[in-house]
Structures are given as C-alpha cells and as structure tokens.
C-alpha cells in the first residue's frame, strides 16, 4: 500500500490525463490550495486550461512518462485515463512517488481480463459468464457455450471503443475487426461475455480513505450507447437488499486493490422487480463519467471527494441535494475549432447547469459538454437535463 500523504500544504498533484474529469479534479484540488500539473497526449486538453503547469507527452511511452514525473517530483500522481504506460507507474512508486490509488490497482483496473479475473475467480463476485479469445475463430468458439447474443470488448480500451453485441456467427468477423480497431496497445485479446438482460445499470461511487471507513455515494443509474455514457440520474431507485449487496462487493474489491481515492464501481441489476440479482461489471479507480451528476446532486461532488480522500482530508458526510440528472452534449460533425449555440436556451429553467468542457476540436459522438438538472423527482430531473442538452449545437468555430 502506498504511504498516506502528509498534512503539509500546498501539495503538488500531477494528473496523467487531462480531459473533462481531470479538469474538475484540478479545480477541486486548487480550491484546497494545491498546485496542479496537467499531462496529456495533446495540447489544449480541458484540464490544461486550469492547471499551473502543462506537459504534452506520448502517454503510452514509459520513458516519457517516467521522465515527466521525475522532472516535477509531484506529491501525488493521479491517473485520470486508461491509455497509460502503467508498468512505469510501479517503477515510480518504488522510487517513493505516491500513485493514486496504487500502481498495482491502476494496472489491474486498466485491463478487463485482470479486473474480471480478480472479481470472479479470486474474490468470488457474481459477474456475467465470460471467456477470452485471441482470434476471430477463438471468439466464435468462446461465444457458443455462452449462448447468442454475446458482448465483445477488447481487454484494453476506453470510452466503449471496440465494443459490440454479436448476435450470431455471421457477426463474428465484424466484431473482431471492431475490437481490434478500438483496442488500446498492441494486444489483440478480447473478452466475450454473456448478454445480460438487466433492468438497471448503476455506478456506485466508492470512497476509500487512507484512514477511516469506506464511504458510498447514493447509487447512480445510467444509460449507454456505443459503449459510452449518455445520461445518468441520482439516486437510482433500488431495493435495500440490492444496495447493500452492491456496497459489500464494492468494499471487497476496493479493499483488495488498496490505496485511497474514489472508485467508480459498475453493476447490473438482473431479474424480476424486487428480487434482482446484483452483478459486478467493471471498476475505474478514479472519478467516473456517470458521476458528473454529482456536481449538482451532492454536497460534495465526486471530484471533491476524490481530492479529499487522496489528500487525507476529512469527509464528514455525503448528502444528496435531491433528484439529479445529467445528459451529455455530443458533437455530430468534425470541426477543427468549435463554437456553441443555444447556451441561453439551455439555462432558462431553474436548477439547471451546463458544463462545456473546452475541448479544442470536435468529431462525431465526441462528448463536448453535459447538462445537469435537479427536479422534484427522477422523471423531472431527467426531463430538464435532456431538454437543456437538446438546446445545444456544436458548430465550427
């Protein structure tokens, strides 16, 4: 386990990955007097606009990654993306650099095969039935015992890249090709999962502290398209027994991974209403995109919770501020420079907020912002967030 950080302030935090989630982490850290260095593979990443220092490096190059960390010697290294030279983090940790949550946890969770084997085989958590394949023929052979359809994902990818639902043998070749195109790194391996018919997908934001109990945010329901988050709402309605089961599994897996910080732990609820089975899906050792809703729905957002946890600061209470919802704002076209229309229309309703991430360019389906809303109930909150997002248009700058 990495050492707990000291109580000395100000602290220097290095973000490995500087997207919209990293930007909110940077803002939360700066409010506590921290110095932030934002690192990413391209200039103009969202967190770079609010950072004290900026570095642009090939994030999957271990030598470049080690060099930038050694040059700055930050108090904490906080990975915020999955496309990283994760093996370099273990070497840096051995030199006394604190990696959040730990280098080992980061490496395990950035590979679907490692986190799935940990959850299912080692910890005995309920997961979808699964197998691995290293070729199109192997994919077909792995899928047959699971029953069609199956879900195919590269073992290393991010933001839903390379995922597909395979309905039968005729789809295997295209699914294999999509997985190879969307994979991160040089590996070709895919995970083949049974297709779960679930009533609800949730993210349970789980806060592990250096000292003190593991804490949980109210569950977040969410919908995905193309393997990527589209909307979320909090709190998601679920039974007490199901919530307790999810919390127990989240605590078990995060305790095994160790370290401190916020983890986004994903589950499916499957089965008849009132007696659903809770099935572990995935885990991210950092703030989660579905958790953007906490910016309006909680007294402490997931980003504030992450920063407090990694700095060893108190978290007296996590309180819901009411029914909250989010809806992403997507680009529909490619633009080298971007502008937005409809901003005023998006903000006409009370208890509605808009975040535009400041990404320098656009491409179809790229997430450019998010609308947030509070409502009297889940339906109203989701309706307001959907309406606000629908007002936005991403155009050429």
Report each predicted region and the residues it spans:
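Active-site "cap" helix and flanking loop/linker of ATP-utilizing ligase/carboxylase catalytic domains
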Residues: 244-265, 284-336
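ATP-binding N-terminal substructure of ATP-dependent carboxylate-amine bond-forming enzymes
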Residues: 1-105, 109-110, 114, 137
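Active-site nucleotide/adenylate-binding loops and adjacent lid/helix of ATP-dependent enzymes
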Residues: 108-203, 207-226, 230-253, 389
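Peripheral (often C-terminal) accessory segments that flank ATP-dependent C-N-forming ligase machineries
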Residues: 308-397
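Short, solvent-exposed loop/turn segments that connect beta-strands within catalytic domains
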Residues: 212-213, 271-277
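A short beta-strand motif that forms the metal-chelation/ATP-contact edge
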Residues: 276-286
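Short beta-strand micro-motifs enriched in acidic
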Residues: 207-209, 268-272, 357
């Amino acid at each position: 386990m990495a050492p707990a950080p000291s109580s000395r302030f100000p602290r220097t935090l290095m973000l490995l990955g500087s997207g919209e989630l990293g930007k909110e982490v940077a803002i939360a850290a700066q409010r506590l007097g921290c110095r932030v260095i934002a690192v990413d593979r391209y200039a103009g990443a969202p967190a770079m606009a609010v950072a004290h220092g900026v570095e642009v490096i090939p994030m999957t190059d271990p030598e470049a990654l080690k060099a930038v960390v050694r040059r700055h010697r930050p108090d904490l290294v906080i990975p915020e993306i999955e496309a990283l030279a994760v093996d370099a983090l273990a070497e840096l940790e051995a030199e006394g650099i604190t990696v959040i949550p730990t280098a080992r946890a980061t490496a395990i969770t950035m590979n679907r095969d490692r986190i799935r084997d940990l959850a299912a085989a080692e910890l005995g958590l309920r997961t979808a039935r699964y197998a691995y394949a290293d070729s199109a023929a192997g994919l077909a052979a792995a899928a047959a015992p699971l029953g069609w359809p199956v879900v195919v994902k590269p073992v290393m990818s991010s933001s839903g890249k390379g995922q597909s639902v395979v309905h039968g043998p005729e789809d295997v070749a295209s699914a294999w090709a999509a997985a190879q195109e969307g994979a991160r790194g040089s590996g070709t391996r895919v995970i083949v999962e049974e297709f779960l018919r679930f009533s609800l997908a949730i993210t349970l934001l789980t806060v592990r502290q250096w000292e003190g109990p593991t804490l949980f945010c109210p569950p977040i329901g969410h919908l995905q398209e193309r393997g990527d988050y589209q909307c979320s709402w909090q709190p998601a309605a679920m039974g007490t027994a199901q919530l307790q089961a999810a919390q127990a599994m989240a605590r078990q897996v995060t305790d095994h991974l160790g370290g401190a910080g916020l983890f986004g732990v994903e589950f499916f609820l499957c089965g008849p209403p009132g007696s659903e089975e809770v099935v572990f899906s995935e885990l991210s050792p950092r703030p989660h995109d579905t958790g953007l809703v906490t910016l309006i729905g909680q007294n402490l957002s997931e980003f504030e919770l992450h920063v407090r946890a990694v700095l060893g600061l108190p978290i007296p209470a996590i309180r819901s501020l009411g029914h909250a919802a989010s809806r992403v704002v997507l680009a529909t076209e490619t633009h080298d420079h971007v502008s937005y229309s409809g901003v005023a229309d998006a903000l006409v309703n009370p208890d509605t907020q808009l975040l535009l991430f400041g990404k320098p360019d656009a491409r179809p389906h790229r997430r450019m912002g998010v609308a947030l809303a509070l409502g009297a109930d889940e339906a109203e909150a989701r309706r307001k967030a959907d309406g606000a997002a629908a007002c936005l248009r991403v155009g050429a700058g």
